[in-house]
Amino acid sequence: MQINEGIHLAYCTNIHRGEGWRETFDGLKNYTLKVRDNVSEGKPFAIGLRLGNSAAIELSEDGSGKIEEFIKWLDENNCYVFTINGFPYGQFHGARVKEQVYRPDWTSNKRLEYTKLLFDILSKILPSGISGSVSTLPGSFKEFISNEEEQGAQIIDNLGVCGDYVKQLRESTGKDMHLGLEPEPLGWFENTIETINFFGRFRSVHGDKYNSIIGVNYDTCHLAIEYENANESLLLLKENDIRISKLHLSSALKLKPDEAAVNYLKKFEEDVYLHQVIARYKNGELVRFRDLPDAIQKFNSNQMVDAVEWRVHFHIPLHSSPSEAFSDTNDHIREALEVLSLAPTLCAHLEMETYTWEVLPKSMQTNDVVDQLSHEYKWTLDELQSVGLISS
């Protein structure tokens, strides 16, 4: 939905299953329209569309009429798409994803072709007068990079090819479309300084011709896990002329690692998603763990006595307090929205992203996924109003 003259808000449909186009479309019909009815008050309803590679290929198949059918459906149901989540290429629910969410990475032509296809689709379904974004992974996963020079060069080359492709689409359609690279714990670049350094390297090859085309998808969960301050991070990115393509509004688990909290945290261990942990020690040192079981094992071996805080990459509902043992990182979301309220042209795209519905502990689930999403909208709209981005 359009929340003011230039800013749009959606929820990301990666919360629903949808590997092929038919399953994806069914999710929009069965869930998204119900959320629309609960929150939109008759206004045009924005969709943050997740399209995996299989779904994108099916939707765009020549002669199938599927994309025309989808455009008609959007119009008939007072909906529109302004952003596509292009991070997960393959299966994202019901099976082990973990680090495989980074495959193929930007060293691969498969990732390039998939992302180009998403922009093809976006160029056709994006309404005139609205900018469009695609979000993607931060190049690769750190442990996949065995040759920094060679693989880094390949990532930068492929992103340049993608930038050229988007530039041509922008010129042929007259639509402002852009790619947002999404820093994430243990991604090839994961925090603000690493992101700035990446763009420095990228621009040393390509110059500044992609500045408006390739930017950052700033995920408030991810940067909070890195113990960053949203005000400082966003202003640093702006000072370095890095476009904020999209703001992901998402929240992480935060806890003081005592025995009771860590025991309760075991409820969040599951086999689908990667739950990176960053522990902060008394001396300010940050120590990273690949997944939640790694951090718990370290704690149980009495090797973390000086750790004063853990932040866990587990997206939790924005409106729901996780438990008495834990806190959340909603303060980072509030900081980001306060920055946006002072500089509304900083970013036009807001997207709530809590894809973990199926693996949440039962105590954190509401009646159903539609109910959860409706509550998240209410929380977010209240926060937007509190900082003046929505008039009362």
Please give the residue ranges for each predicted region.
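Acidic/histidine-rich catalytic cores of soluble enzymes
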Residues: 166-296, 307, 316
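N-terminal pre-domain/capping segments
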Residues: 1-129, 133, 164, 210-213, ...
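Short, acidic/polar
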Residues: 21-36, 66-70, 225-237, 330-339
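Aromatic/hydrophobic pocket-lining residues that form the small-molecule binding cavity
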Residues: 24, 28, 67, 115, ...
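Anion (oxyanion) recognition and catalysis
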Residues: 75-78, 238, 314, 341
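Active-site beta-loop-alpha junctions enriched in small/polar residues
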Residues: 14-16, 50-54, 86-89, 137-141, ...
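Flexible, acidic glycine-rich loops studded with aromatic residues
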Residues: 287-392
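Active-site acidic/histidine proton-transfer and metal-coordination neighborhood
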Residues: 95-215, 225
